[in-house]
Structures are given as structure tokens and as C-alpha cells.
Amino acid sequence: MKVDDPENKVNNKFRYDKLSKASLIVSILLSIILISTIILRERGLQKTEELRKIYYEGTDLTELSKKSEVQKSEPHKIQKSFEELLKINPETVGWIKAGNLADEPVVYRDNEHYLKYDFYGHRNSIGTVFIDAHNSDWKHSKYLILYGHYLKNGGKFGSLKRYKNIEDLKNNLTITWNTIYEDEPEEYVVFSVFESSMLKSEKDYFYLRRFEELKTGEKEIEKLIEELKKRSIYNIPVEVSPNDKIMCLVTCSYGTRDGRLLVFSRKIRPNEVVDTLKDKIIKKTEFTNEK
């Protein structure tokens, strides 16, 4: 009959207690990190509300529209609404408002920094909405790409997921892009919404910078526009031509590997009325459910 060694029992108990304490410490540290992340996110979203107050208190879009007619031949001047924002962050380039789904300041730098830093320059996982680094001439570019994090509470570009709902699309069909300069804000109308992968190995892969690299003529651009409309989950009766200015809003989506939700819009033409389009929009297919 085997007799347990009392010393082994003591050693085993000591090792067990040591492992238990280590597990407890790790659990506590992970909890602290999680709580800290949540607190930082909430503070970041509160700060965004402060930025909106600064921006809208200094903005008179009616007066700005009148000024733009006079100032078209003058050098660009900074709008009053952006003066305070530029003091906080000199890399500010504009403000994006996608109906009631996104209302954010926009910055320009590289494609990495603002994934992890807020508008105030603090490290924060909510990031900041930014223009693609390849849009260096963002003021005159005919194709703009704007990135924003997907937050489950709807912050940043998180609420763009509501474009999956046809009623939300109809209610948020237009997007306003206002640069820091004293020009009239540009109005855009959505013409394509779809999910894609950033991985070349996936069948739903889409290369975002294709517009920039199409310099061979209008036919190639027309084919790309046709592809965007074909990929869209909606039939949206918006005519798009190679001469139109196009904007793409990008956020993460979890229905495919390394997925992105892409919302394409084009600049509204002079005297164009888009409200009448709402009743003509048809949904073609369903999105993959979010995880």
C-alpha cells in the first residue's frame, strides 16, 4: 500500500496556492485594463460632444453659403467654426455629417496614428475619423476615403451599420462634407452600400484606391462605378459619371474576414433634388448578420 509523503502534500498545496494567487492577480489586472479601456472610451465620446459644441457654435452654414459666392476667386481662408478646433489639433481638415449616423471632426496624417489616438492627441482606442493618407490633395481630390472605427455604442462610424436598414438609408441619404476653408459645404448622396474584405484571398475583396489609380480613361471609371452599383445591397437610382466627385466612408464589419462596411456617395449636382429618390430605393439582398 502506497503511503502519501506529507512533504509532497505540503509542496503540492503550496504550488496550488501560488497558482491560485497568480490567476487571481492576472484576473484583477485584466479587469483593471478592461475597466480603464471602457472609461477611456466613454471619456473620448464625451470629448467628441464637446468638439461638436465648439464646431456648431461657430458655424453659420447659411451665412457661409452666401460668403462662398463672393470668395470663390479669393485664396482659401479658415472658417471661424474651425479656428478653435485647429488650436486643439492642427491636423484638422474638415467635418463629416452622415445624416444622423455620424457627426465627427476629420483629420489628415498617415493611416496608422489616428487608429489609436483621439482628436486631443491622447492614446485612445476610439481613434479619430481620418482621410486616407493617399488623399494628400484632399481639398481638390475627386475621390475621398474617410475611415472611422466601428464602436458598438454607435460612436465614430459605428452607426453606419444602420445603412443596412432601408428606412435608415432613406432617412440618411445625404452626407455633408465641410472643409476648414471658407467654401460652401459639399452635399453628397449615397449610391452604394456593401460589405467587403480587405484580404485579396477573399472573393468579396475590394481595393479601395482603385479610383485613384484609374488614369487610363473614362471607360475604366465607368466600369468601376457599375461594379459599385452591382455590389450594393440596394438599387439606388442615382446616376454617377466619371466627372462626379466621390466619397467613401469606411468602417469595420464582422460578416467577413477582415471585413469593411463601405458607403459610397457622390457630390450632389447643382439644382439636383434627391428627396424624390427615397421611394424608388429597393433592397436587393440581406447583409450577413453582425457578430
Regions found by a protein language model. Name each.
Residues M1-K18:
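N-terminal Lys/Arg-rich, disordered targeting/topogenic segments
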Residues S20-S31:
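Hydrophobic H-region at the start of alpha-helical membrane spans
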Residues S31-K291:
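Solvent-exposed, non-transmembrane regions of membrane-associated and secreted proteins
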